[in-house]
């Protein structure tokens, strides 16, 4: 088989080691490229290194990956790489941990603005291997890595007519550092929408439609945000600290809408097909927005997060709920 320019595709060998990133979103950006590699090299073993435990959850149950390793130690990765014919670093900031590898190493270059990060990784592996991309290749892949078949809200008291909106209130920094980071740096962190704005948004939506209920997610370090939201918004289902990435993916299938700022869970939602409303300040949705952009996705972009008005978000949310209604099957949630 020849490539479109008449050359033979690159021979990767029998075993390839892929090196991903340390953040959930950046690892999700790698998944279309991994699927592309497995599609074109079905007999090659692709093992993968994620740099920490939480971001590794992206790859749980991913059938394109044979073995998942978790380490950010350069010496361990250098030793591991000796067992592989090719090593491909899928995230440019992970290049430091692969710098000890002396041969058969390829790495995604620094990312540029104006092109989605997932597309840049995908374009790199397509060019590197010599295989042609199609539109079908532009899709995230999140595996069924959940240990249970039930929904994360299976035991919640949910009515037949409830409209469920999932919101993720934090970001990568609050997920790791919790309230100390939030209260010391909340005015400096450019990706965060103020918690008071989320609360105002929620209560405006409930006033617009009393059937609306909110499901909030996050890591255990973000429990302080959940308590504040739950206290101010009646009927909230608080799942903060209770879900893995595969469970979040499963949760999205039960939601009518997902709303958040630019964060890893936004990309989980993007992979799931749920109607999605993303809030962007200085970060560019062309780089890190929903992927690929669909009719049931809206990205609100302002110069700063503080410039995003809850009333504008309410209007966009109600439009998505009207345009993409969902019929919930309560069997999967538990009947009440």
Question: How would you describe each model-predicted region?
Answer:
Residues 1-336:
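Catalytic machinery of carbohydrate-active enzymes
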